Amino acid sequence: MSQLSMSWMGLGHTAASPWLLLLLAGASCLLAYILTPIYGVFENSLRLRCFPQPPKRNWILGHLGLIQSSEEGLLYIQSLVRTFRDACCWWVGPLHPVIRIFHPAFIKPVVLAPALVAPKDTVFYRFLKPWLGDGLLMSTGDKWSRHRRMLTPAFHFNILKPYVKVFNDSTNIMHAKWQRLASKGSAYLNMFEHISLMTLDSLQKCVFSFDSNCQEKPSEYITAILELSTLVARRHQRLLLHVDLFYYLTHDGMRFRKACRLVHDFTDAVIRERRRTLLDQGGVDVLKAKAKAKTLDFIDVLLLSKDEHGKALSDEDIRAEADTFMFGGHDTTASGLSWILYNLARHPEYQERCRQEVRELLRDREPEEIEWDDLAQLPFLTMCIKESLRLHPPVTAISRCCTQDIVLPDGRVIPKGVISRISIFGTHHNPAVWPDPEVYDPFRFDADNVKGRSPLAFIPFSAGPRNCIGQTFAMSEMKVALALTLLRFRVLPDDKEPRRKPELILRAEGGLWLKVEPLSAGAQ
């Protein structure tokens, strides 16, 4: 009977063949493998209908390509914020929905969720993995939690205090260059170029206790870091190069690998030498003596770190964290400082008020140097920094891919597995949160005006359990560099308005050019 029933298919006796059954089982598994994500997308698309969305380009591309890394892209984000006010749905192709969020109340349940519930989305950051390894930026789960606990003491104010001297020294070197370049009265300078070298100079001294003199002469290591940042940003813009197989066959891919090797070799050599020194000079007691003398660098702190079970970090872990700090600490601070100087150049009345505040603080002090305790004595300068970070946040967005449904304040739900794109730029430019958001107004951060405002309205360093661990380091460096710069130079805007360019960090197309005029000793 079975033979008869299958004969219409032309199978005859072969219908009972175990090979055919195996083939059918394999086909069923393949079909399930294909259909399951499609069903998931279909189910999510139904659940996401409660989120409005702008018009798509077409059903294949979705919204892909509507936001470019350009001035126009940022203006488009501002139009989304004005239209949707809190959140909208965004389709990357036909299968990948993203919820873009730009209001503090809707950001809150995502960023304040436990780190294991709201891990960082790694779609973009995976390009950094060969360079940064499993450092805090890239790691997830238990490894991230363990490293975060172990690294938190590295950013205690007792560790950071001695770094202020480094910030002063590196800023002084930069200013000596500016004085030479402005010997005829003034000079037009690309702020990103000069300040990036200054922040890298500081970081090398704070992380490795190494002075490469990179502000005065070329450094292979510094050149490699700058090149890696450029290559990652460029790769992100070219979809075909997202495929590793293609990328590493290109000239850019080969340059990326070469620069990675150079950076890793430098960090590995420092770690090996430091461990050898520890063995020769008495091990952990040497580090404890350095800690007492307040001369620990970041590598020392990592070598001292132990988890709750007494287990130390491996050399590979130390390299990943050191490389991550070098990456995360130079570009963001350079972007922040460059845009702060731009905003003060456009508002000379605020620039002059900051200058007077610094002069009053350093009155009759020789040498003119900012100390740790001074950082809390510059309230207006701090307000100007914060307002610039609001208007021009170095990192314009962060992403989370939640492992469970996230319920928003109005009852809408972001389904598990859907990426949440938290627009720092959009939140900072949201007129429902910040009146006249395009106006540079430092008094927004006056103590009276801060009252009643959500702490998530201002998130240049992210927020929640995965916020920036080095934000105090960054703010301290910006305060020192800005205070000394305004004490010694008048900063004037270029005739041409810069076009913003969001990449890994917020840059300006062709650089951010400003005019600097040295102030006479009497004027200082």
Curated annotation (Swiss-Prot):
Taxonomy, superkingdom: Eukaryota
Primary subcellular site in the record, as a coarse category: endoplasmic reticulum
Pfam families, per database record: p450 (PF00067)
Topology within the bilayer: Single-pass membrane protein
Pathway this chain belongs to: Lipid metabolism; leukotriene B4 degradation
MF-aspect GO terms: heme binding; iron ion binding; long-chain fatty acid omega-1 hydroxylase activity
Entry GO CC: endoplasmic reticulum membrane
UniProt note on tissues of expression: Highest level in polymorphonuclear leukocytes and dendritic cells. Detectable in lymph nodes, spleen, bone marrow and peripheral blood. Highly expressed in ovary. Very low level in liver, kidney, and smooth muscle. Expressed in neutrophils (at protein level).
Names of the cofactor(s): heme
Keyword Heme listed: yes
GO BP of this protein: leukotriene B4 metabolic process
Induction of the gene: Up-regulated in bone marrow-derived dendritic cells by bacterial lipopolysaccharide (LPS), a ligand for toll-like receptor 4 (TLR4), and by poly(I:C), a ligand for TLR3.
Mutant lacking the gene: phenotype: Mice are born at the expected Mendelian rate. No visible phenotype.
Residues given in the record as heme binding sites: 468
InterPro entries linked to this entry: Cyt_P450 (IPR001128), Cyt_P450_CS (IPR017972), Cyt_P450_E_grp-I (IPR002401), Cyt_P450_sf (IPR036396), Cytochrome_P450_Monoox (IPR050196)
Parts of the chain that traverse the membrane: 19-39
Compartments, record wording: Endoplasmic reticulum membrane; Microsome membrane
Annotated keywords: Endoplasmic reticulum, Heme, Iron, Lipid metabolism, Membrane, Metal-binding, Microsome, Monooxygenase, Oxidoreductase, Transmembrane, Transmembrane helix
Record field: catalytic activity: leukotriene B4 + reduced [NADPH--hemoprotein reductase] + O2 = 18-hydroxy-leukotriene B4 + oxidized [NADPH--hemoprotein reductase] + H2O + H(+); leukotriene B4 + reduced [NADPH--hemoprotein reductase] + O2 = 19-hydroxy-leukotriene B4 + oxidized [NADPH--hemoprotein reductase] + H2O + H(+)
Function: A cytochrome P450 monooxygenase involved in the metabolism of the pro-inflammatory lipid mediator leukotriene B4 (LTB4). Hydroxylates at the omega-1 and omega-2 positions LTB4. This oxidation step leads to LTB4 inactivation, which is postulated to be a crucial part of the resolution of inflammation. Mechanistically, uses molecular oxygen inserting one oxygen atom into a substrate, and reducing the second into a water molecule, with two electrons provided by NADPH via cytochrome P450 reductase (CPR; NADPH-ferrihemoprotein reductase).
Recorded family membership: Belongs to the cytochrome P450 family.
Protein name: Cytochrome P450 4F3
Species for this entry: Mus musculus
